[in-house]
Curated annotation (Swiss-Prot):
<dbReference type="InterPro" id="IPR006301">
    <property type="entry name" value="FlhA"/>
</dbReference>
<comment type="function">
    <text>Required for formation of the rod structure of the flagellar apparatus. Together with FliI and FliH, may constitute the export apparatus of flagellin.</text>
</comment>
<feature type="transmembrane region" description="Helical">
    <location>
        <begin position="71"/>
        <end position="91"/>
    </location>
</feature>
<keyword id="KW-0812">Transmembrane</keyword>
<keyword id="KW-1006">Bacterial flagellum protein export</keyword>
<keyword id="KW-0472">Membrane</keyword>
<feature type="transmembrane region" description="Helical">
    <location>
        <begin position="95"/>
        <end position="115"/>
    </location>
</feature>
<feature type="transmembrane region" description="Helical">
    <location>
        <begin position="46"/>
        <end position="66"/>
    </location>
</feature>
<dbReference type="InterPro" id="IPR042194">
    <property type="entry name" value="FHIPEP_1"/>
</dbReference>
<keyword id="KW-0653">Protein transport</keyword>
<feature type="transmembrane region" description="Helical">
    <location>
        <begin position="247"/>
        <end position="267"/>
    </location>
</feature>
<keyword id="KW-1133">Transmembrane helix</keyword>
<feature type="transmembrane region" description="Helical">
    <location>
        <begin position="24"/>
        <end position="44"/>
    </location>
</feature>
<keyword id="KW-1003">Cell membrane</keyword>
<feature type="transmembrane region" description="Helical">
    <location>
        <begin position="121"/>
        <end position="141"/>
    </location>
</feature>
<dbReference type="Pfam" id="PF00771">
    <property type="entry name" value="FHIPEP"/>
</dbReference>
<keyword id="KW-0813">Transport</keyword>
Amino acid sequence: MANLVAMLRLPSNLKSTQWQILAGPILILLILSMMVLPLPAFILDLLFTFNIALSIMVLLVAMFTQRTLDFAAFPTILLFTTLLRLALNVASTRIILMEGHTGAAAAGKVVEAFGHFLVGGNFAIGIVVFIILVIINFMVITKGAGRIAEVGARFVLDGMPGKQMAIDADLNAGLIGEDEAKKRRSEVTQEADFYGSMDGASKFVRGDAIAGILIMVINVVGGLLVGVLQHGMSIGSAAESYTLLTIGDGLVAQIPALVISTAAGVIVTRVSTDQDVGEQMVGQLFSNPRVMLLAAAVLGLLGMVPGMPNLVFLLFTAALLGLAWWLRGREEKAPEEPQPVKMPENNSVVEATWNDVQLEDSLGMEVGYRLIPMVDFQQDGELLGRIRSIRKKFAQDMGFLPPVVHIRDNMDLQPARYRILMKGVEIGSGDAYPGRWLAINPGTAAGTLPGEKTVDPAFGLDAIWIESALKEQAQIQGFTVVEASTVVATHLNHLIGQFSAELFGRQEAQQLLDRVSQEMPKLTEDLVPGVVTLTTLHKVLQNLLAEKVPIRDMRTILETLAEHAPLQSDPHELTAVVRVALGRAITQQWFPGNEEVQVIGLDTALERLLLQALQGGGGLEPGLADRLLAQTQEALSRQEMLGAPPVLLVNHALRPLLSRFLRRSLPQLVVLSNLELSDNRHIRMTATIGGK
């Protein structure tokens, strides 16, 4: 009993919004019941009338809608109205076949009116009218609207990344706020979803038109069989009775279908403005009196041709002339807008400001349009998250936060191409193919794979772009397999490390100093700028980063500078002193946990020769420089084969000279001095440069 009372109270507890939520399920239940349950003729009249009214409402809403997204529910409504018409066809077919022998009113007054009054009771005329309506709906309106929806969906989807990037650019420039950006992104997504849905929903209408023809044929044939075989009617009376009912049923269904198809065409062909379709049509068709005059002249000439219906043509000629005269008079009576006062020519152009100066980003990336989904968080792009992780990991490893990577699309690039820029200059580029995998050969992979051969952009190893299905096979053969976003992120990470010294500017030096001052205020207060200038500190830190030395241990760096800067102001000399102070960290960086360090060494005779050249102030002889470079390259190759770090150990005085000389040709080589190695490590020479 309590449950019954609760059910009776349910309608009073539902709010208007809750009734709106139930509208969809109620309509589905109604459609299903129409297909399953036999309905009386009066209920069919109500449902046919409701279908006609609904189609007219949909058309009027489409006409008065100013923007496509104002009627975003149209694809769903199109589906429901199609199902409603098909359900009505099923219900009316059932009652026509069951009660058609009783007379013209067997399927209700609406079907009778459409079958008798609209076509004069002549079933041949009814069949012709029905077929014409189906052809208009199927071949003209629906086909055209479907094609427009297909092309519109394609263009909307192609333009979606550009719109997203434009919104991000406006947001970054401060032209819009975060809420407005979210609203615009939502509208762009809704527009793409709408046209994509319309592309598919148009197929429902075409299928409905085909179903209407088949249902008519089935009704006529079935009616003849039922009337003749079951009810003993003659073939002529059965054909007349059942065919007229079928024609009425078909017309009462096809006319709303034609109206709905017209509404679909209006929706997909309209242009989003501040005017509805009627205002656009009237305003643009009848705005020019010259057009009316020319049209009147053409009709007047046709009206004077012998044998033509002169009265009709001349009536329309007079109407168009009157319309042109009225439009011309309205233009002449329109109040003239006050003309703005013209400023002198030299003041008419807005003066340039400093806001017009575009500064280059410290670090940027440009991508082709195929790579835009990788950097769009709304499309689950992983690259943005990877870049954030790269910056965080780099800050933890090297001791400073690299600049933000500004990403933008560049339609001049190849679709799968990307470029990495530093201060507006390209420092790296490559190709990436979303959905495919890069199989990198580390030198030990066996066999080959089908795909596009390329080179790993970060380390220059041979690689192949393969399909996802070949991923496991590539791993079995010894390839290192990574996805497209990982390729780009690894390349970016490699370049940030390679150019870390250039990315560390005075601004970053000051920010790092401010961060250190929070922990050690007394040290920084006494040191900068009293003992060492910010310029000198910046140069020392840059020198360390240029040789891959982390600057995390700022306490040691600042204390060393505080001790030696009063005696030495040369940044390169101060860098050498700081490197010795950071010796344990440098040793740990290249030889973690190894008591024995395997390094490349210099022959004693070559070392003496280099020291003499350094003390004499002269440069290296060209022949000696070439031999030194060639032997270093050979030793480095042997070092890599042993799996040892690419480290060259030299005399402390020679380290800066050899580092600058060899780093140009062998950027992977690390030059350490004997003073920078920890005392508790045992040194083993794997190769000697300059030896016999």
